[in-house]
């Protein structure tokens, strides 16, 4: 089962074939999201609102559809995830969102699907890069 990073969802939305085709090839019931990913997307929408309100509205519709499509497969930050995040955060400096996604993947035994493999290297989670499947 897979925990999909924000960059894969964003690139699939933009029609990037690597991300789009990978998502289409996987059973939807095997695809999970972190609440952190929802927050990252909302941050982007909020920033976009300042420069392009119409694009922000479109992105917000997309976010709401993601929430509907993955309603039973959105993973929270539980106490177990928080404890795992603390362990991971002590390993090396890193982005808090990535560390929380890694902790979520570790606790729920999911493979992180991301283009940013180096962000998850040596954090104790399996990683899959749809841009480098060969």
Describe each model-derived feature in a short phrase:
Residues 12, 111-114:
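Short, hydrophobic beta-strand segments that form beta-sheet elements in well-ordered domains
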Residues 2, 20-96, 100-111, 121-125, ...:
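PIN-domain endoribonuclease scaffold, especially VapC-family toxins
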Residues 11-17, 122:
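Short N-terminal helix/helix-N-cap motif within the alpha/beta-hydrolase-1
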């Amino acid at each position: 089962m897979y925990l999909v990073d924000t960059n894969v969802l964003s690139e699939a939305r933009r029609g990037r074939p690597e991300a789009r085709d990978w998502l289409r090839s996987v059973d939807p019931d095997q695809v999970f999201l972190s609440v952190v990913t929802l927050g990252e997307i909302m941050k982007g929408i909020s920033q976009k609102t300042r420069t392009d309100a119409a694009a922000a509205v479109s992105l917000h519709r997309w976010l709401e559809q993601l929430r509907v499509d993955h309603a039973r497969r959105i993973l929270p930050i539980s106490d177990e995830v928080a404890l795992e995040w603390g362990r991971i955060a002590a390993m090396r400096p890193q982005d808090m969102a990535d560390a929380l996604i890694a902790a979520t993947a570790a606790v729920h035994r999911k493979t992180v699907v991301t283009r940013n493999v180096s962000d998850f290297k040596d954090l104790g989670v399996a990683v899959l890069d749809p841009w480098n499947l060969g």
